[in-house]
A protein has these predicted regions:
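Hydrophobic h-region of N-terminal signal peptides that target proteins for export
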Residues: 8-19
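Sec-dependent signal peptide recognition
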Residues: 1-8
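Short beta-strand edge/turn micro-motifs at domain boundaries
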Residues: 111-147, 255-280
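Short, structured motif recognition centered on aromatic/hydrophobic residues
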Residues: 35, 83-84, 96-100, 113-118, ...
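Surface-exposed, charged secondary-structure patches
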Residues: 62, 71-111, 211-253
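Short, low-complexity N-terminal intrinsically disordered segments enriched in polar/charged residues
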Residues: 18-46, 50, 135-184, 188, ...
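C-terminal functional regions that serve as terminal interaction/effector modules
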Residues: 23, 200-207, 214-287
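Short, well-ordered alpha-helical segments enriched in acidic and aromatic residues
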Residues: 41-62, 67-68, 180-199, 204-208
Length: 287
């Protein structure tokens, strides 16, 4: 009897999985839009808490557990924030994806581009595992119905079990190259349709824009990876870590977030984001 029920449950689970249509980049974008809609309807705090995975990472400004941070009422985001996806991608295995697009704080007090890593959980729901963003000098026009650009599909690994080691090796090689000559190394590490996200300008897209963005950046970047993950298909991965560089005569520290994709040429970047930590304010005179 027990065996019969166990077999029936297994078959039911299998049929449910088979009945579920394959996920696409549009599904990742749809999850992002539902997340944004809940933030408008119920507030940022409830939305960020409801849509975050148990192991989700936020930056406060250093990497921290989202669940632990939101447990403190003082850390819950407040105010009104608008954002919408314009670029997204997904693994062939359908459980790991990302999206990015413009954001704007109510009243135009701040604006930039968000960057979210998404994972489809065992219950079929999408939840974000990392949320970050880059401020820009100018706001993008508010277009929540903007057309979505989907990243092309990656190439699945023959042995998915070794994919994370490959990503770590690729990132270690990139870190060494960035420490020697970041302006040459960064463009070479990107797929042609990738993105560079830095504070100030809009995201750089295309080879000419990559070269310009890298030329405007630091000569050398020192990095240390903190974490990340890879898809079951071994074709998409995300990483984040610490970064340090010299700029304008000052030593800056910050963080990077990346999405890597495997294609026929190996592993390269779809998105490379790097932002400095907020600068400390000088103490008031006499304080």
């Amino acid at each position: 009897m027990i065996l019969r029920f166990a077999l029936a449950a297994t078959l039911a689970a299998a049929s449910t999985a088979l009945a579920r249509p394959p996920s696409t980049a549009a599904d990742v974008a749809a999850a992002e839009r539902r997340f944004a809609a809940m933030a408008q309807a119920e507030g940022l705090g409830p939305a960020f808490a409801a849509w975050s995975a148990e192991d989700a990472v936020i930056f406060t400004p250093r990497p921290a557990s989202a669940k632990a941070a939101y447990a403190d009422p003082n850390n819950r985001p407040a105010g009104r924030l608008l954002w919408w996806p314009v670029y997204a991608g997904i693994a062939r295995s359908g459980e790991l994806g990302f999206s990015t697009g413009p954001f704007e704080v109510e009243g135009g007090r701040a604006h930039g581009w968000y960057f979210t890593i998404w994972r489809r959980e065992s219950d079929g729901r999408w939840r974000w595992v990392l949320d970050h963003g880059t401020p820009t000098r100018e706001a993008a026009p508010y277009r929540p119905d903007a057309a979505l650009t989907a990243a092309p599909a990656g190439r699945p690994a023959r042995r998915a079990a070794g994919s994370w080691d490959e990503v770590r090796s690729a990132e270690a090689r990139l870190a060494a190259a960035l420490a020697a000559d970041a302006r040459s190394a960064l463009p070479a590490a990107l797929w042609d349709d990738g993105r560079i996200m830095r504070p100030g300008p809009q995201p750089a897209v295309g080879r000419a824009a990559f070269a310009a963005a890298a030329a405007a950046g630091p000569e050398r970047i020192e990095e240390s990876r903190i974490g990340g993950g890879v898809s079951k298909a071994g074709d998409l991965a995300w990483t984040y870590g610490e970064a340090a560089w010299d700029e304008g005569g000052a030593r800056l520290e910050g963080h990077y977030v990346r999405v890597w994709q495997r294609r026929s040429g190996g592993w390269k970047l779809l998105v490379d984001e790097m932002t400095p930590l907020p600068r400390r304010r000088a103490p008031a005179a006499g304080g």
